From Swiss-Prot:
Gene assigned in the entry: rpsC
Lineage: Bacteria, Pseudomonadati, Chlorobiota, Chlorobiia, Chlorobiales
Species: Chlorobium limicola (strain DSM 245 / NBRC 103803 / 6330)
Domain KH type-2: residue ranges: 39-109
SUPFAM superfamilies registered for this protein in UniProt: Prokaryotic type KH domain (KH-domain type II), Ribosomal protein S3 C-terminal domain
Name the record gives this protein: Small ribosomal subunit protein uS3
Pfam family, one: Ribosomal_S3_C
Entry keywords, A to Z: Ribonucleoprotein, Ribosomal protein, RNA-binding, rRNA-binding
Biological-process GO terms, alphabetical: translation
Amino acid sequence: MGQKVNPTGFRLGIIKDWTSRWYDDSPVISEKIKQDHVIRNYVLARLKREKAGIARIVIERTTKHVKINIYAARPGAVVGRKGEEINNLSQELTRITGKEVKIDVVEVIKPEIEAQLIGDNIAYQLENRVSFRRAMKQAIQQAMRAGAEGIRIRCAGRLGGAEIARAEQYKEGKIPLHTIRANIDYASVTAHTIAGTIGIKVWVYKGEVLVQRIDAIEEDEMKRMKDRRADSKSRPRDPRSKRRRSRTKRA
């Protein structure tokens, strides 16, 4: 199943966290989920013109306000001159949600290994008639130079304007999809070209997480087992237990 399931959903609650971090058991929960979808689409559409490079948008809710964390490769494009862009964005989102909106912009340190940004970059190049092989290979080289342990990119559709659709993929390093502790960043992007739409999927392996914690748990368990064995050997045996064994054998 590791090869089929979405790598992010497969690891949610273990090493990955949700992008909507709030809880509600009221009947209007569906409206809030729909509102999150509207917020994300609006922010992405507005900041796409600024070429801010949005990796992900995390939404947190309380009873009084909505907090939005925007992870961007170019945070200056989100903030704007003297904070004009972020203030206008906050006002528009307040109008949409009906609550006070607080926006925090977080800079993405290594955009070369963010799956969403890689997919967006390849889609942009394909829409501008760049060779798909060249775009894929350049993205792989940049990701491996930036510190990724493995990357796989798959493009499917009318590649190069061909009449028959096909799929091609390139891979470098390792992508352990079955290992739950493996931190794999995944993104799916659609490029709208003259020949039609091209689907782009990106897997980036950034290394293992929880390794130290798992090793510590295993060491503690081994230590406990050794202590139990030592205690059992040091305890004097009850002579009555031998008598009971002999009686059971005679019976």
